[in-house]
């Protein structure tokens, strides 16, 4: 059982609506108020079912002890499922809460119990003294105790690497590195014309990652039927609808293709590894991430948070010559897992399960690594630009390094800033704790001024030795390579987040939002005026080879059909009536050329429309329409019909 104990001036509640597991109640308990009370928010858990009487007795002891400390004889028992992710059955929860209520009354306490299984509005006024907010965990004998903080779900103690702990304590210094090559104090830097850089600097220095309100992309990802929360899973694990899956697939194929052009070989490796593997155990403590853990056959396993493990173990077993270097391998992880803090999770911005293109490059020495770093920096800029995220306006650059590396490679770091064409934030460490000496990230700044890392490259000086990775040089001697870690785009989900946030901000400025044509789930929508025009529309769609076309053949007004196409950000909308059936050209509303409330209509042939779309999407991945072509036959994934 989890208890959150609040000494309150008052607590009051009002029942609103029953859930499927609601207990039957009398009218008298549909609302309640208690003053000068100890409010006990309680969640009965699965392990409690093994010995409920023990849990009642120990819960009684815990509540009485706190009540005596705060000098009250009034207790409000309030069922609060949000304290745990491992709840008991509803029947057991009611049994334990009723047992606890009776036990408290038997000890002379004035007790009220809010009903179980009902949605309730409640108001509480906490007294605010040192003992006014306490938490307690009750476990049956033989069950391992797990402590929780107030209002946080009870979980097994999370596995936190030494790198995470160090990151929380590590001292570093922030500067602005300008295009003139000078390091400047971020507190006195003139941010005129660099509003997003200022927002990023504030975000970095405050280190506040928790979410206080929902960003616009959350509503958009649902309205566009791309993705949604999955209540049946752990927070930060999403469901993807057909349109979103198609977008993800094309982004994945694009990034893999760009890596292949640079000589990267695609591999696939396991998603879980042994925590006691001597090499992996050391690496866990050098990587700043929190892990999911799995117990199987008495083994403690962790779910990977990157593809490093599998690729490095593969590198260890390979025979590598200096002639093979630089050697690149890439894996598109579906998925990588990081147990991000619950308060930081929101939409597609920060997830616990995500799709990450993860490329590693083995280089002969530091000079070779620096050259590759510069090449991959350029690759990342170009990758995001094609996706639709521009270095000039959409993201800010962070470069992080040790002081020694900066002093030895200042001109190279300055060249990165010049390529960005704008000042960047740099973070300098006095000494190296992590496995890398240099890294950059491209950080997208959203409408709430939160930053999220996209592309990144790191120079790794530890893991070749840790994993015993070698290559044979010209003299036949074994040497350790320098390793680059690169994600050309960052997490695929974050790319979609960035596109949606960008268009939300553009819309606020009066622009017409749209996705890049190559990523739009539907590229052309054909709107029929009446049922008799449907066969012609179908024939028209058949002529549009390698274009994603759907047909709005619903029994709706033409106006509604066109408005709905606008809400879905369809790049090209064609309306078909009698005139179009008898003519050579069709009227096409071109979204990219339109203004709000002022659509741009262009007359063109079907062949001209197809040619235009093929030019806009040339050399980019193509997927067929991911949903049923007929809107009349298409199910809705979000909302009601």
Swiss-Prot record:
GO terms for cellular component: cytoplasm. It catalyses: tRNA(Thr) + L-threonine + ATP = L-threonyl-tRNA(Thr) + AMP + diphosphate + H(+). It holds the Pfam family tRNA-Thr_ED. GO terms for molecular function: ATP binding; threonine-tRNA ligase activity; tRNA binding; zinc ion binding. Its EC number is 6.1.1.3. CDD domains: ThrRS_anticodon. Zn(2+) binds at residues 308, 360, 485. It comes from the Archaea. Residues 216-516 are annotated as: Catalytic. Residues 1-154 are annotated as: Editing domain. Its cofactor is Zn(2+). It is an enzyme of class 6 (ligase). Binds 1 zinc ion per subunit. GO terms for biological process: threonyl-tRNA aminoacylation. The keyword Cytoplasm applies. InterPro entries: aa-tRNA-synt_IIb, aa-tRNA-synth_II, aa-tRNA-synth_II/BPL/LPL, Anticodon-bd, Anticodon-bd_dom_sf, DTD-like_sf, Thr-tRNA-ligase_IIa, Threonyl-tRNA_syn_edit_dom_arc. The N-terminal domain is an archaea-specific tRNA-editing domain that hydrolyzes incorrectly charged L-seryl-tRNA(Thr). Catalysis of tRNA editing is performed by the charged tRNA itself. Belongs to the class-II aminoacyl-tRNA synthetase family. This is Threonine--tRNA ligase. It comes from Methanocella arvoryzae (strain DSM 22066 / NBRC 105507 / MRE50). The lineage of its organism: Archaea, Methanobacteriati, Methanobacteriota, Stenosarchaea group, Methanomicrobia.
């Amino acid at each position: 059982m989890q208890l959150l104990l609040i000494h309150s001036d008052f607590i009051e509640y009002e029942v609103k609506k029953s859930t499927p597991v609601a207990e039957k109640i009398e009218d008298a308990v549909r609302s309640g108020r208690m003053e000068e009370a100890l409010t006990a928010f309680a969640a009965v858990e699965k392990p409690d079912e093994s010995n409920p009487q023990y849990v009642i007795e120990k819960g009684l002891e815990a509540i009485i002890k706190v009540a005596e400390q705060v000098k009250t004889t009034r207790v409000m028992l309030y069922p609060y499922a949000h304290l745990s992710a491992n709840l008991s059955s509803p029947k057991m929860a009611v049994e334990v809460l009723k047992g606890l209520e009776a036990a408290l009354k038997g000890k002379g306490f004035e007790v009220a119990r809010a009903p179980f299984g009902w949605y309730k509005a409640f108001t509480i006024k906490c007294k605010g003294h040192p003992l006014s907010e306490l938490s307690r965990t009750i476990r049956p004998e033989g069950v391992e105790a797990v402590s929780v903080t107030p209002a946080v779900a009870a979980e097994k103690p999370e596995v936190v690497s030494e790198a995470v702990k160090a990151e929380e304590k590590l001292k570093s210094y922030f500067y602005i590195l300008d295009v003139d090559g000078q390091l400047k104090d971020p507190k006195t830097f003139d941010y005129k014309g660099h509003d997003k850089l200022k927002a990023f600097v504030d975000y970095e220095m405050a280190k506040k990652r928790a979410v206080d309100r929902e960003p616009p992309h959350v509503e958009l990802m649902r309205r566009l039927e791309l993705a949604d929360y999955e209540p049946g899973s752990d927070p930060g694990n999403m469901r993807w609808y057909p349109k979103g899956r198609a977008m993800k697939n094309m982004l994945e194929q694009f990034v893999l293709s760009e890596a292949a052009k640079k000589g990267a070989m695609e591999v696939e490796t396991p998603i879980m590894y042994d925590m006691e593997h001597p090499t992996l155990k050391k690496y866990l403590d050098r990587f700043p991430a929190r892990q999911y853990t799995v117990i199987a056959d008495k083994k403690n396993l962790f779910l990977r948070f990157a593809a490093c493990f599998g690729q490095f173990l593969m590198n260890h077993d390979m025979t590598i010559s200096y002639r093979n270097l630089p050697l690149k391998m890439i894996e598109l992880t579906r998925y990588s897992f990081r147990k991000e803090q619950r308060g930081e999770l929101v939409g597609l911005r920060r997830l616990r399960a995500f799709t990450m293109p993860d490329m590693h490059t083995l280089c002969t020495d530091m000079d070779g690594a620096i050259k590759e770093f510069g090449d991959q920096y350029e690759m990342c800029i170009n990758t995001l630009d094609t996706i639709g995220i521009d270095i000039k306006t959409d993201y800010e650059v962070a470069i992080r390094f040790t002081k020694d590396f900066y002093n030895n490679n200042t001109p190279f770091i300055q060249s990165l800033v010049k390529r960005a064409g704008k000042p960047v934030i740099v973070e300098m460490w006095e000494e190296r704790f992590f496995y890398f000496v240099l890294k950059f990230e491209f950080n997208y700044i959203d409408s709430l001024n939160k930053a999220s890392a996209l592309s990144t490259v790191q120079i790794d000086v530890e893991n070749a030795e840790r994993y015993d990775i070698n290559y044979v040089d010209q003299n036949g001697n074994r040497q350790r390579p320098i390793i680059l870690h690169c994600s050309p785009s960052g997490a695929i989900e974050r790319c979609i987040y960035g596109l949606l946030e960008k268009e939300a901000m553009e819309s606020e400025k009066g622009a017409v939002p749209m996705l890049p044509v190559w990523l739009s789930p539907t590229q052309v929508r054909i709107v029929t005026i009446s049922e008799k025009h449907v066969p012609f529309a179908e024939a028209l769609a058949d002529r549009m080879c390698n274009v994603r076309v759907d047909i709005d053949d619903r029994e709706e007004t033409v106006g509604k059909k066109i408005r709905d196409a606008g809400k879905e950000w369809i790049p090209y909308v064609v309306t078909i009536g009698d005139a179009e059936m008898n003519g050579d050209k069709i009227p096409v509303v071109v979204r990219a050329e339109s203004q709000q409330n002022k659509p741009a209509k262009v007359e063109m042939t079907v062949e001209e429309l197809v040619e235009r779309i093929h030019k806009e999407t040339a050399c980019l991945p193509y997927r067929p329409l991911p949903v049923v072509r007929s809107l009349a036959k298409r199910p809705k994934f979000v909302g009601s019909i």
